[in-house]
């Protein structure tokens, strides 16, 4: 195994373990109120899209299967936190968007969650390290697949 391959795999494993450790801590935090963390994830994704989002677009943000996402949307809709709306771009599709109650729940939980994220991340990282981590992770999420597969760096 080449040095580049070894360090890439070590970096991936460390990143994966760090994300899993932090995710467990954040999920266990007493900040969610009446929402499950994945329900909050949907509300958070919708908070940035007042015109609504297609359900298929939400799947990338929440990382659920299509049937799981459909059940989650139905639960949130039955609780009055989201509503369906016509998609002006495709009459066969619909969008989901926050209701006033959903926006309120998102803001309340989001404030507590954001504070807890900050506490968790700043416990061991300086501001400069957080900026560097953010920038590195942005690079990982914006790298075209083709260049990664071709081995370009």
Please identify what each model-predicted range represents.
Residues 1-33, 79, 139, 153:
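N-terminal leader segment of winged-helix/HTH proteins
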């Amino acid at each position: 195994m080449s040095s580049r391959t070894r360090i890439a795999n070590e970096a991936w494993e460390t990143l994966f373990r760090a994300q899993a450790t932090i995710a467990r801590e954040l999920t266990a935090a007493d900040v969610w109120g009446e929402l499950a963390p994945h329900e909050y994830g949907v509300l958070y994704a919708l908070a940035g899209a007042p015109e609504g989002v297609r359900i298929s677009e939400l799947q990338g943000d929440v990382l659920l299967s299509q049937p799981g996402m459909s059940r989650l949307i139905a639960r949130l809709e039955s609780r009055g936190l989201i509503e369906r709306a016509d998609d002006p771009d495709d009459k066969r599709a619909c969008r989901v968007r926050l209701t006033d109650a959903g926006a309120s729940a998102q803001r309340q939980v989001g404030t507590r969650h954001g504070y807890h994220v900050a506490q968790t991340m700043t416990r061991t990282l300086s501001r400069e390290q957080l900026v560097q981590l953010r920038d590195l992770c942005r690079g990982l999420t914006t790298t075209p697949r083709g260049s990664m597969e071709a081995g370009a760096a």
